[in-house]
């Protein structure tokens, strides 16, 4: 939906390189990209088209009745994230000085504003099920839902690289509720789409869909009558 087209595996991997890693797409004939594509196809072997394998994806925490708070998130970050990711979100470089033991969460070496993690639900869901490292799992989270939303708000309010997103979401009605860049079809602000509260947006979109469904039924009846 983001690109408005059917995407190849190469396109999906390239998006990860350019957005989540804030890097460049690999040459389509490179050894590395061929290896990644082969691995992805192997993992997906036997999975039926349009099905969702059990345990895949990121499930957002329970939506809050308030906006996620960067201020409260700072306290969570300081207490539970800073020891690995650094006071300034710089991460921890590995001994080889070529990679990171703990990745940077903001700044020039972090993911850019086009990455999936820049959406609060993606970040909050990921940290709720996985962080702090070696202390949490999806069955035994170490962070509460509130802490997950708030620390996501804090990290995603910090400076990071920007990507040209002008061609994203050609059908704006399909933008996720937490996509933080307008325009939108629902009348809510960019601020609310970024930090919430998200429940009013969900309810408004539900009503939009119900209204569209009623219009479609009326049109269908009119066609039959004519």
Question: What residues fall within each predicted segment?
Answer:
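The canonical Cys-X-X-Cys-His
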Residues: 36, 73-92, 105, 151-155
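Acidic/His-rich structured neighborhood in mature extracellular/periplasmic domains
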Residues: 7, 35-38, 57-61, 79
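Short cysteine/histidine-rich zinc-coordinating motifs and their immediately flanking basic loops
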Residues: 94-99
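N-terminal export/targeting leaders of redox proteins
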Residues: 2-14, 18-37, 41-45, 161-226
């Amino acid at each position: 939906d983001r690109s408005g087209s059917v995407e190849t595996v190469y396109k999906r991997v390239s998006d990860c390189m350019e957005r989540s890693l804030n890097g460049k797409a690999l040459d389509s004939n490179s050894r590395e990209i061929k290896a990644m594509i082969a691995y992805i196809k192997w993992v997906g072997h036997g999975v039926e088209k349009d099905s969702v394998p059990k345990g895949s994806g990121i499930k957002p925490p329970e939506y809050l009745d308030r906006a996620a708070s960067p201020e409260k998130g700072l306290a969570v970050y300081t207490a539970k994230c800073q020891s690995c990711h650094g006071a300034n979100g710089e991460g921890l470089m590995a001994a080889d000085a070529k990679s990171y033991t703990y990745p940077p969460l903001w700044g020039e070496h972090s993911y850019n504003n086009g990455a999936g993690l820049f959406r609060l639900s993606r970040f909050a869901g990921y940290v709720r099920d996985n962080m702090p490292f070696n202390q949490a799992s999806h069955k035994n989270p170490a962070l509460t839902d509130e802490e997950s939303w708030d620390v996501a708000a804090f990290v995603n309010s910090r400076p990071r690289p920007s990507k040209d997103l002008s061609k994203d979401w050609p059908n704006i009605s399909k933008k996720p509720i937490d996509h933080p860049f307008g325009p939108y079809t629902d009348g809510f602000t960019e601020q609310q789409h970024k930090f919430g509260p998200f429940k009013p947006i969900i309810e408004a979109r539900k009503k939009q869909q119900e209204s569209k469904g009623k219009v479609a039924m009326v049109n269908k009846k009119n066609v039959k009558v004519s």
